């Protein structure tokens, strides 16, 4: 079995790659995916987003090693094990990132990935239902829209931000990210619109694209060139041959794992496990970054939250409305209002992100408050803490060793303390007067730095945005894994294209920049001229040096 291009992983970037590489009928493409079908209400119904993430059928279910700065808790680290990868189990939140994020990438050695370079790819990939204005695309395969925004708590949140003196934004994915506004989601006609929906399924209708369900064991490297992938299916081990290139799009955990199993990585680590070293790249598995968040929860004194819909009977009603009519609560992820704020004067770009939810409940659907309530997921998104992904064993089926090293930088504590106090200021605005009851979490007794730190150690968790473990950079950077054209340094015919190549975490959710990475990598692979650079100038708060709002 062989093809011109073999793509490992059908997630956000892998699906985009499959679609773009196969547009030319002369190119044959094989996509390798271990996970099964995405058909079914648990994935397709937007409001059911908590279910697939908690199901072994759809999620690799990784756990970090004990995190020393978080009471030695092991933090859940889900990754999609299904057609569409993590885009099939995520929260469907659509955030491109800030212009400064991508300019930073270029400064770190990813030449050609500045904001002016990547904006045309964001436009190419999206079908924005907010219209085209020079910043947004309307002809792409990825549907992007706002939710219904019917709950009054969404409007109270945005109004509270205005009352607190913060900026408002009509389109945080357009010229102005900073401020309070309404959140966008990747849904369409009442369904999740994953990378599989947008890219992979249309590509699979072409005769030159094949999807193989299998377990990828390692990349076959002969004489310094990737020639195929060793896979396991039906109890048999075989090799799928690549006539041109192998592209790894297996996630920020599994992409470095595959490289190391194939002999590409830190030589000492590989030798310790008895793996033949093909290329010594010490950066493989290093530079792990993520977003952390906590839930700030408040009781609602009015029965307007989603709490009424939590009993099984009413969940069934909502499910039936969605199943038969594609209407009701089921058509939205319920993250319909948001904010992107700067933590202090002198901070040029937003670094605090809010997802507002009109119910008090954990992201995984557990530990719901036994009353009407509302919450925000609060995250400081530009942490300086760095972790790693290493091999547990030379056995391809052994889970990787994930060490996030969360909160290892002192600045993270300072920023998250500020997040707690800032959120109290926002929830204390007049817009919430008619809804605001007692604080559930952190709780009104949590006031001092020490009390806030104790709360954070017990309640901070991942926002599920890992990246950076196969860092893109210049060839003379010893910690870079791929060059700016996504080629693995030191191996011919091998690329990595997913969130693992991000030199620095972007500000916001990672599905959008991961898909963009697949789009742009496809042009590099095909030898196409990159899309023309944009001349749009993003909005930067003119008061950024002297004010946080």
Swiss-Prot record:
* Record's keyword annotation contains Metal-binding: no
Give the record's keywords alphabetically.
Answer: FAD, Flavoprotein, NAD, Oxidoreductase
Which PROSITE patterns does the protein's record reference? GMC_OXRED_1 (PS00623), GMC_OXRED_2 (PS00624)
Q: What class of enzyme is it?
A: oxidoreductase
Q: Which residues bind FAD?
A: 4-33
List of catalytic residues: 465
GO terms for MF: betaine-aldehyde dehydrogenase (NAD+) activity; choline dehydrogenase activity; flavin adenine dinucleotide binding
Q: Which GO terms describe its cellular component?
A: membrane
* Stored InterPro entries: BetA, FAD/NAD-bd_sf, GMC_OxRdtase, GMC_OxRdtase_N, GMC_OxRtase_C
NCBIfam families membership: betA (TIGR01810), PRK02106.1 (NF002550)
Q: What is this protein called?
A: Oxygen-dependent choline dehydrogenase
Q: Which organism is it from?
A: Sinorhizobium fredii (strain NBRC 101917 / NGR234)
Q: What is the lineage of its organism?
A: Bacteria, Pseudomonadati, Pseudomonadota, Alphaproteobacteria, Hyphomicrobiales
């Amino acid at each position: 079995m062989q093809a011109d291009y073999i793509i490992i992983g059908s997630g956000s970037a892998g699906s985009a790659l499959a679609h773009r590489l196969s547009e030319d009928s002369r190119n044959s493409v094989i996509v390798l995916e271990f996970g099964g079908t995405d058909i079914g209400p648990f994935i397709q119904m937007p409001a059911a987003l908590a279910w697939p993430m908690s199901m072994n059928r759809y999620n690799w279910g990784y756990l970090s090693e004990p995190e020393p700065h978080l009471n030695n808790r092991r933090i859940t680290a889900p990754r999609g094990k299904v057609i569409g990868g993590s885009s099939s189990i995520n929260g469907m939140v659509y955030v491109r990132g800030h212009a400064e994020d991508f300019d930073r990438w270029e400064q770190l050695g990813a030449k050609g990935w500045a904001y002016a370079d990547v904006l045309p790819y964001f436009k190419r990939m999206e079908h924005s239902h907010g219209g085209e204005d020079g910043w947004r695309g309307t002809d792409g395969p990825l549907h992007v829209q706002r939710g219904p925004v019917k709950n009054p708590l969404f409007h109270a949140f945005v109004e509270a931000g205005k009352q607190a003196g913060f900026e408002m934004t009509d389109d945080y994915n357009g010229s102005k990210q900073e401020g309070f506004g309404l959140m966008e989601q990747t849904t369409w006609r009442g369904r999740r619109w994953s990378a599989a929906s947008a890219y992979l399924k249309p590509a699979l209708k072409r005769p030159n694209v094949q999807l193989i369900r299998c377990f990828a064991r390692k990349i076959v490297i002969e004489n310094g060139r990737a020639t195929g992938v060793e896979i396991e299916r039906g109890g048999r081990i075989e090799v799928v041959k690549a006539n041109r290139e192998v592209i790894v799009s297996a996630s920020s955990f599994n992409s470095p794992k595959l490289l190391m199993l194939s002999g590409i990585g830190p030589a000492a680590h590989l030798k310790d496990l008895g793996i033949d070293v093909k290329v010594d790249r010490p950066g493989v598995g290093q530079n792990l970054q993520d977003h952390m968040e906590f839930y700030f929860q408040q009781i609602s004194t009015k029965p307007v939250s989603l709490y009424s819909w939590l009993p099984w009977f009413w969940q069934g009603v909502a499910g039936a409305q969605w199943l038969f009519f594609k209407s009701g609560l089921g058509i939205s992820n319920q993250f319909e209002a948001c904010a992107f704020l700067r933590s202090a004067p002198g901070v040029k770009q937003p670094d605090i992100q809010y997802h507002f939810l009109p119910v008090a409940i954990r992201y995984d659907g557990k530990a719901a408050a036994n009353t009407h309530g509302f919450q925000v997921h609060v995250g400081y998104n530009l942490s300086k803490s760095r972790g790693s992904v290493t091999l547990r064993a030379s056995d391809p089926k052994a889970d990787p060793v994930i060490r996030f090293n969360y909160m290892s930088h002192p600045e993270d504590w300072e920023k998250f303390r500020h997040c707690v106090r800032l959120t109290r200021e926002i929830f204390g605005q007049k817009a919430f007067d008619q809804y605001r009851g007692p604080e559930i979490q952190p709780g009104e007794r949590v006031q001092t730095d020490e009390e806030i730190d104790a709360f954070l150690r017990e309640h901070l968790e991942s926002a599920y945005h890992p990246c950076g473990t196969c860092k893109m950079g210049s060839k003379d950077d010893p910690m870079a894994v791929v060059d700016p054209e996504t080629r693995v340094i030191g191996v011919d015919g091998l690329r990595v294209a997913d969130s693992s190549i991000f030199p620095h975490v972007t500000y916001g959710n990672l599905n959008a920049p991961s898909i963009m990475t697949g789009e742009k990598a496809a042009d590099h692979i095909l030898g196409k001229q990159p899309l023309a650079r944009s001349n749009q100038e993003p909005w930067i708060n003119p008061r950024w040096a002297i004010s946080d709002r």
